[in-house]
Design a protein with these regions (language model features):
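Histidine-centered divalent metal-coordination motifs
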Residues: 49, 53
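Post-HEXXH active-site segment of zinc metalloproteases
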Residues: 55-84
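Poly-acidic low-complexity segments
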Residues: 18, 26-30, 37, 64-67, ...
Length: 133
């Protein structure tokens, strides 16, 4: 769970970002708020990950692959910069599992319901099968 000391330090270091307890970890670009679950055992890691989204100015995305790219960028920043800066041991396997869940989501989302081939995204939530046409 995120320590009060870490949360207070982040609030002091980033006064333009709100840090608010919530049910899930997430970054809201429109609200300029990092939401965090104060009871999660891996809370400090995920808190820094959501902070990375904020520092990278991540907001909406048009294509699903853009979301996966943003997740990878945020994990890279969490591991390479923020973990050392704030003295948080980031479990890189846990970070990779989190990123893998997005890759799996993208893989499943892009599968053609008729033939199972992965297609190409043409619009926000639409995919076109490269096998079926």
């Amino acid at each position: 769970m995120p320590s009060k000391n870490l949360i207070n330090t982040l609030r002091a270091d980033y006064p333009h970002i709100e840090f608010t307890p919530g049910e899930h970890f997430k970054w809201s670009a429109s609200e300029k708020t990092v939401y965090f679950n104060a009871r999660d055992d891996a809370g400090e890691t995920f808190l820094l990950h959501e902070l990375a989204h904020a520092l990278l100015d991540h907001d909406d995305f048009d294509l699903d692959i853009q979301l996966v790219r943003k997740e990878a960028e945020a994990w890279d920043m969490t591991i390479a910069e923020l973990s050392d800066k704030y003295g948080v041991d980031v479990d890189e396997k846990e970070a990779e599992m989190s990123l893998e869940s997005y890759r799996h989501w993208l893989f499943m989302r892009s599968k053609c319901p008729d033939c199972g081939t992965n297609g190409l995204q043409t619009k926000n939530t639409h995919y076109k099968c490269i096998a079926c046409g």
